[in-house]
């Protein structure tokens, strides 16, 4: 999976699916409280974060209240990440192998600078496009689980179980109810994923260059025993830092679509489509309503995306080294 056409021979889609599944589930479980708080904030008219936390803390089972909806969230994020990373890798491999989008320059990593990643190196437009397409496809497949997750986390519905939530949605809204807000979700997720991959790859390249251009950093790398491929903790640190910054930027740009999407999924009868929902929210609550939950979403996305991508890249790196029979340097 390192650069270009031989990448697909070095690791199968199985590795990408498994790595994506594991990283997605782990990040979802750890960050479920932040996701639940974001949903509660976006469903109401500017309820404060402290008030929401206080209400959850006063429930009979505090831990269970904060981790409500963990199962659908873990399933959605886990399998969503698995599908996303698998399809993203396939798209990136095909672009690199067949020289698609060559007019805007597929990067030749063999002659390029040292990089913290073993994944294909593509141009900015290729990174933006493949990230957006892969996320839109994964989002459509996982949309029913997303609807159940959001409804189950919300206090607008008194669902006792995940199965009960799914049954009620089907009986009251039909099969179409499982895809409420897909337009807003796709408009949010596709640009977010595309921007994230674009920012992430650029930041990794720049941070890798800094590490090997600054004498002190170069000395530190040598002391760690890290060679040209930047294996081990240095690579993981660069990937994580790049992920945090990339997620923060992409989240801030796409948050209005996330706020609109949540309203459509929670109250589909009141907010029937993307345009109407946006106008209604701004008209009744002001522009600020489009940025409800931004702080929580930015914090959660920064950590979850960075964590998922760092774990994913590390698992793939180790799988490739094991595949080639090389020693794994941590």
From Swiss-Prot:
Start-end of each Solcar repeat: 11-94, 122-206, 234-318
Keywords for the protein's UniProt record, in alphabetical order: Membrane, Mitochondrion, Mitochondrion inner membrane, Repeat, Transmembrane, Transmembrane helix, Transport
InterPro entries: Hem25/SLC25A38, Mitochondrial_sb/sol_carrier, Mt_carrier_dom_sf
Membrane-crossing segments per the record: 17-42, 69-95, 128-153, 181-204, 238-264, 293-311
Pfam families, per database record: Mito_carr
Catalytic activity: glycine(in) = glycine(out)
Keyword Signal: no
Signal sequence range: none
UniProt-annotated location(s): Mitochondrion inner membrane
Topology relative to the membrane: Multi-pass membrane protein
One Gene Ontology CC term in the entry: mitochondrion
One of the protein's GO biological processes: heme biosynthetic process
GO molecular function, one term: glycine transmembrane transporter activity
Claim: Coiled coil is one of the keywords in the record: no
Family, per entry: Belongs to the mitochondrial carrier (TC 2.A.29) family. SLC25A38 subfamily.
HAMAP family referenced in this protein's UniProt entry, alphabetically: SLC25A38 (MF_03064)
Function: Mitochondrial glycine transporter that imports glycine into the mitochondrial matrix. Plays an important role in providing glycine for the first enzymatic step in heme biosynthesis, the condensation of glycine with succinyl-CoA to produce 5-aminolevulinate (ALA) in the mitochondrial matrix.
PANTHER family, A to Z: MITOCHONDRIAL GLYCINE TRANSPORTER (PTHR46181:SF3)
Protein name from the UniProt record: Mitochondrial glycine transporter
Organism field: Sclerotinia sclerotiorum (strain ATCC 18683 / 1980 / Ss-1)
